C-alpha cells in the first residue's frame, strides 16, 4: 500500500543508540511518501541531530530509574501531565501511527497514542528490554525486537508474545551496503584497528589503546589505528599518542562523520557493545573486540554481543579483563593467521538481520492497511 498522506510520528531520544535506528526508519518512510514528524525532548541529542533531516516537535520528559525519592514520587504526576500534552500534540499532527524507539520521550507519546486509538509500534534495540518498552509493550500494536530476548516468555504475556517480531536493528543504507563486500585480509602486513569510544567517549578504552599500539610494535605486530575518542577525551588521548609514530595512526578524532568509510577501512574493531555499534559491525562483517559498559542498565551491553560471541564472530572482554595481555592474546593470533579474521567476518554477517528497516516498514503498512 502507499503511505502517501499518512502522518507517522517517530519518537526516540537520549542516545545515538535510540536516535540513529529511528533516523534510518524515518528516511525509509519518507521515501515511501509518508509525512514524518519526530517528537523528542529539548536540550537533547535528538534536538541537535534531527532538525537537519526532519521536522521535530518537543515535549518535556524524564526518567525515574536511579533518581531520588522526591522525583520518584512526582514522576507519575509528570507522566500524566506529559501524556495529556502528547494527546493534544498527536491530535494536532493528525497522527495515523506512532513508532517508539525508546528513550524517556517515547513513554508519554506512545501512551497517549494508545489512549486515543492510534496504532503504536515499539522497537527495542537491546538484548534486554528497557523499562520504557516493558511498560509500552502492554499497549503496543506491534512489538519489534532487535535480538532474541532470553526468557521473553517470563516477561511477556501470551498476548504480547503473539504481537512480537524479531526484526534486527535498522542500520543506514551505506553501512548495509558493506554486507555485500567480501573482506580480504591477506594482502597487507598492517592490521587496521578502528577504535570507537562512543559519543561520550570511553575513558578506559581511550587510555589502554595507545599502550596497546606501543606493546604490539615491540612484539612485531604492525597496527594502524583510527581512534574515535568521544568529545570529552580528545586532547587527553592525543597526548597519550605523542610518542607513537604517525605511521601507526590513521586519525584521532572526537567523532567520525562517515562511519561507512571507517568500517570499510578497518580489519578489526575495539568498541563498547551498544546495540547500534554491535549491529553495524555485524552487518558490515567486521570482527570486533567488545568491551561492554560496566554501568549499562541490566548489563544489556554484555547480552547484546552473546550471539556474535557464540558464533565465533567476535570477542567480549569485561572492562576489568581489558588488559594488555588479554588484548594481545586475541590480536596476536589474528595477525598471524588472517584467515581467522576472514572467517569471523563471514560469521558476523550471518548473526544479524540485514533487512530490518524493510521489515519494520512492512509492519507499518500492514497496520495502516487494516486500520
Swiss-Prot record:
It is found in: Cell inner membrane. GO terms for molecular function: UDP-N-acetyl-D-glucosamine:N-acetylmuramoyl-L-alanyl-D-glutamyl-meso-2,6-diaminopimelyl-D-alanyl-D-alanine-diphosphoundecaprenol 4-beta-N-acetylglucosaminlytransferase activity; undecaprenyldiphospho-muramoylpentapeptide beta-N-acetylglucosaminyltransferase activity. Keywords: Cell cycle, Cell division, Cell inner membrane, Cell membrane, Cell shape, Cell wall biogenesis/degradation, Glycosyltransferase, Membrane, Peptidoglycan synthesis, Transferase. The keyword Cell division applies. Its main location: membrane. Its EC number is 2.4.1.227. Pathway: Cell wall biogenesis; peptidoglycan biosynthesis. It is a peripheral membrane protein. It catalyses: di-trans,octa-cis-undecaprenyl diphospho-N-acetyl-alpha-D-muramoyl-L-alanyl-D-glutamyl-meso-2,6-diaminopimeloyl-D-alanyl-D-alanine + UDP-N-acetyl-alpha-D-glucosamine = di-trans,octa-cis-undecaprenyl diphospho-[N-acetyl-alpha-D-glucosaminyl-(1->4)]-N-acetyl-alpha-D-muramoyl-L-alanyl-D-glutamyl-meso-2,6-diaminopimeloyl-D-alanyl-D-alanine + UDP + H(+). UDP-N-acetyl-alpha-D-glucosamine binds at residues 15-17, 126, 172, 199, 256, 275-280, 301. Belongs to the glycosyltransferase 28 family. MurG subfamily. This is UDP-N-acetylglucosamine--N-acetylmuramyl-(pentapeptide) pyrophosphoryl-undecaprenol N-acetylglucosamine transferase. It comes from Francisella tularensis subsp. mediasiatica (strain FSC147). The gene is murG.
Amino acid at each position: 500500500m502507499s503511505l502517501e498522506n499518512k502522518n507517522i510520528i517517530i519518537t526516540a531520544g537520549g542516545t545515538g543508540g535510540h536516535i540513529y535506528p529511528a533516523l534510518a526508519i524515518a528516511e525509509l518512510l519518507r521515501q515511501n511518501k509518508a509525512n514524518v514528524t519526530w517528537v523528542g525532548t529539548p536540550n537533547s541529542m535528538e534536538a541537535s541531530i534531527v532538525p537537519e533531516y526532519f521536522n521535530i516537535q518537543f515535549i518535556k520528559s524524564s526518567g525515574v530509574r536511579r533518581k531520588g525519592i522526591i522525583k520518584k514520587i512526582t514522576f507519575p504526576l509528570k507522566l500524566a501531565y506529559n501524556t495529556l500534552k502528547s494527546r493534544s500534540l498527536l491530535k494536532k499532527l493528525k497522527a495515523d501511527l506512532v513508532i517508539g524507539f525508546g528513550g524517556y520521550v517515547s513513554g508519554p507519546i506512545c501512551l497517549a497514542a494508545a489512549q486515543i486509538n492510534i496504532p503504536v509500534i515499539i522497537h527495542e534495540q537491546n538484548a534486554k528490554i528497557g523499562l520504557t518498552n516493558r511498560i509500552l509493550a502492554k499497549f503496543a500494536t506491534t512489538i519489534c525486537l532487535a535480538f532474541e530476548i532470553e526468557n521473553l516468555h517470563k516477561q511477556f504475556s501470551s498476548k504480547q508474545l503473539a504481537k512480537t517480531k524479531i526484526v534486527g536493528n535498522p542500520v543506514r543504507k551505506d553501512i548495509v551496503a558493506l554486507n555485500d563486500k567480501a573482506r580480504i585480509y591477506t594482502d597487507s602486513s598492517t592490521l587496521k584497528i578502528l577504535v570507537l569510544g562512543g559519543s561520550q567517549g570511553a575513558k578506559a578504552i581511550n587510555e589502554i589503546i595507545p599502550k596497546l599500539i606501543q606493546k604490539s610494535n615491540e612484539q612485531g605486530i604492525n597496527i594502524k589505528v583510527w581512534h574515535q575518542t568521544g568529545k570529552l577525551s580528545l586532547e587527553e588521548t592525543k597526548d597519550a599518542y605523542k610518542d607513537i609514530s604517525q605511521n601507526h595512526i590513521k586519525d584521532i578524532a572526537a567523532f567520525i562523520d562517515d562511519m561507512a568509510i571507517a568500517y570499510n577501512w578497518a580489519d578489526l574493531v575495539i568498541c563498547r557493545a551498544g546495540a547500534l555499534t554491535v549491529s553495524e559491525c555485524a552487518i558490515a562483517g567486521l570482527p570486533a573486540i567488545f568491551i561492554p559498559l560496566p554501568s549499562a542498565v541490566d548489563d544489556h551491553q554484555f547480552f547484546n554481543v552473546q550471539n556474535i560471541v557464540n558464533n565465533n564472530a567476535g570477542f567480549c572482554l569485561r572492562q576489568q579483563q581489558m588488559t594488555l595481555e588479554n588484548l594481545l592474546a586475541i590480536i596476536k593470533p589474528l595477525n598471524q593467521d588472517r584467515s581467522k579474521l576472514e572467517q569471523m567476518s563471514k560469521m558476523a554477517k550471518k548473526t544479524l538481520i540485514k533487512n530490518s528497516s524493510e521489515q519494520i516498514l512492512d509492519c507499518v503498512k500492514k497496520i495502516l492497511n487494516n486500520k
